[in-house]
C-alpha cells in the first residue's frame, strides 16, 4: 500500500547446495538447512524432511564450513557469488521457489513526477526488468558450468515428483492460514510447470 509497481526484476529460481548428495526427500531427512524467514518456505522445507535454521546470509558460508548447517538454498547467482559450492558442493536444481524482485516507487514520489517523467521512468523500469531476466538466465548456465569445473556436483534431475508429494502437508497449513486462494495459486503454478517442461 502506498507504492506503485513498475516492473519485475529477476533473482531467479532458488536451488539447494548441500554437503552430501540430495536427490529426494529421503536424503533431506534430518539435514540442517539454512533458509530465510518465510512461513511457507519453512513449512515446505520441513515437510521435505529438513531441519530449518534461519540465519543472515553473511553467516551461512562459515555455518556450513563449521557444520552448524549442512546446506542452504538460494538462486544460482547467490550460490555462485557467495561461493557456497566450496563448502556445500552438491548443487541440486530443485527450482523450488521463484524469486522475483519487484521494482516499485512510492505513490508520493510518483505523484511529484511530471507525466513525461512518469512515462520515462515506466519505460526505463520495463527495459531494465527485461535486461535483468535475460542476464540472470544466461548467468545461471555459465555459473553452473564454472562451479562444476571447480568441483561442484550438479544434480539437474532430482526426484521432483517425490519433493512435490512431500510438500503437500505444507499446502494444507497454507490453506488453513490463507484460505482457498492457495488452491488457485497451486493450479496456476501447475499449469505453468506443465508448459515449461
PLM segments and residue spans:
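N-terminal secretory/targeting leader peptides
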Residues: 1-197
